Amino acid sequence: RDDIAQRRAMLLVDEVGGHERILAQFALCPGEDPTYHHIEDGAWPEDVPYATIHRLASAGHVGGIGRLCVQWCLQQGLPVRADTHADNTYMQHTLKACGFVRCGTIYTEDGTPRWAYYHYAI
């Protein structure tokens, strides 16, 4: 709900048989993310304003939808950071395919480790 209230929730939809269907949802959050202040086993390549991709989820109707969402984020004019679990190979593949580089490990508020990725502004 916070993503909606702050106008950062995004939906990717299409139309089939005259009805819209949700293909994916994600949040693009501009500004500093406190979770990213400390990074281990690496470093962020630059210290500039950025946006973060959070909560990317596909409905599973169409292949490659995660990549389309990430590519849209990259077109918004800011460097982009993202993170994912070590076992989320789908997201790791999507980020790498879109040109992200792994920069190290960050930890969520509850201490969960996440692989951290970065893409320069395009």
Predicted regions and their residues:
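Conserved acetyl-CoA-binding loop-helix of GNAT-fold acetyltransferases
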Residues: 58-75, 92-97
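Conserved acyl-donor/pantetheine-binding loop and adjacent beta-alpha core of acyl/acetyltransferases
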Residues: 27-61
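Active-site rim helix/loop that mediates acceptor-substrate recognition in acyltransferases
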Residues: 1-10, 17
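Short hydrophobic/aromatic beta-strand element in the GNAT-like acyltransferase core
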Residues: 8-13, 25, 55, 114-116
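Conserved active-site alpha-helix within GNAT-family acetyltransferase domains
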Residues: 67, 86-105, 112
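Conserved GNAT acetyl-CoA-binding A-motif
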Residues: 52, 75-87
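C-terminal "cap" of GNAT-fold acetyltransferases
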Residues: 45-46, 108-122
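Glycine-rich acetyl-CoA-binding "A-motif" of GNAT/NAT acetyltransferases
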Residues: 19-24, 90
